Amino acid sequence: MSEDLDRRHFLARLWTWGLGVMAGAAAWTSWDFLQPVAGQSGGPVATVSPDKIPTDSVLEVPAMRGYLTEIEGATEAIWWKCPHLGCKVPWCETSGQFECPCHGSVYNRKGEYRRGPAPRGMDRFEFTIIDGVVVPDTSKIIRGAPAGTPETINEPPKGPECLDPTAG
């Protein structure tokens, strides 16, 4: 009988030890996952001089992961990340608007919400002009206005959309 008792204690300790190892591994990987990726935290990014920014389209700037445009004399630095699920939102030259390929959200040239499942307009970056160059700070994000907020620019679509508006 004492042999069964020893075996029972051994198995109980083995299970406890095994569960402890699994819990430790889960905690370790979760902690590792929550740490910021080196070099991904954002910061100032030198781009182009203001006279190179289009007034009727957008300029894609991969280094800042976004776009620059000029609207009524004001520069806008727009993050290309969709606020719905984080997809990269490309500019559609034919329609003159941003169109998310993941779920069909559409934004005007200023990144303001037009339609789709996104909860708000596209986020923007704060920026300064240093030595004649636009320098967005990708660590300083300005949250887009909530869906349903009236657009501040009057630019209807120029033509056909790049994505099928009935898809999604």
Outline where the language-model segments fall.
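Interfacial helix-loop-helix junctions of multi-pass membrane proteins
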Residues: 117-118
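Membrane-embedded segments
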Residues: 81, 88-112, 121
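N-terminal pre-ligand scaffold of iron-sulfur
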Residues: 3, 9-95, 125-168
